[in-house]
Amino acid sequence: MVGIMKKKIILSACVALAMAFSLPSQAQRLIPKQRGIEVVGSVPLIKGEKFLAADNFGMGASLTHYLGRENYTFVMAEYEQQNMPYRSYNVKLKDALLQMGYMHPVLSDNGKNVFLYGGISALGGYEQLNEDKKLLPDGATLLDRSHFVYGGVVHGSAEVFLTDRVLFLVKAQGRFLFGTDVHRFRPAVSAGLRFNF
């Protein structure tokens, strides 16, 4: 009888423990002053190019800081590389950018597991064109130059809580760059993870 009772107590404790870890505890989500680290990979959307063209990619890391009512600010360091076709040669365009911005919730489910955000940010950085080489392989001179760039970004984001502290993100952004000699508007899509602490 005592052996059966021990087994039932152990089984009940295991079930209670499993339930505690499997049920979301939303009290720990989106707390004001909560911070997070975000890592994303991105793909630039280039008119006339395949969606996942070789050597067209980006990556970024950001720090987030939650304010009240599920909104947050962020600072992001980002690198993006694109190939611009010229005859049989690809001219490399590389951007190293720093963004500072604000995201505001637009829509969420009742359980606060899925959020849609809209936001804006300011950016600045350096754009390198063809590794600063002025001559192309066919002898043509590249008139566009490397520059410091600045501008603004509009963001859209879908964020899903995988656990109370880990989110899966899918983002779209449209960058408006000034100071550049090529493509002032640069859309991109990205996906990644955020770890809140």
Task: Place the predicted regions along the sequence by residue.
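Extracellular loop and loop/strand-boundary signature of outer-membrane beta-barrel proteins
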Residues: I46-E49, M84-V91, D138-D144, R175-T180
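Predominantly the C-terminal beta-signal and adjacent terminal strand-loop region
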Residues: E80-N83, S157-F197
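Short glycine/proline- and aromatic-enriched beta-strand/turn motifs that initiate or cap beta-hairpins
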Residues: Q26-M76, R194-N196
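Residues on the lipid-exposed face of transmembrane beta-strands in outer-membrane beta-barrel proteins
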Residues: V39-G41, M59-H65, L98-H104, I120-G124, ...
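Cleavable N-terminal export/targeting peptides
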Residues: M1-K33
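Residues that define the transmembrane beta-barrel architecture of outer-membrane proteins
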Residues: K33-R35, A53-M59, K92-L98, V114, ...
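Short, positively charged, low-complexity/disordered linker segments
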Residues: L136-T163
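Gram-negative (and chloroplast) outer-membrane scaffold detector with strong preference
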Residues: S62-P137, V166, F195-F197
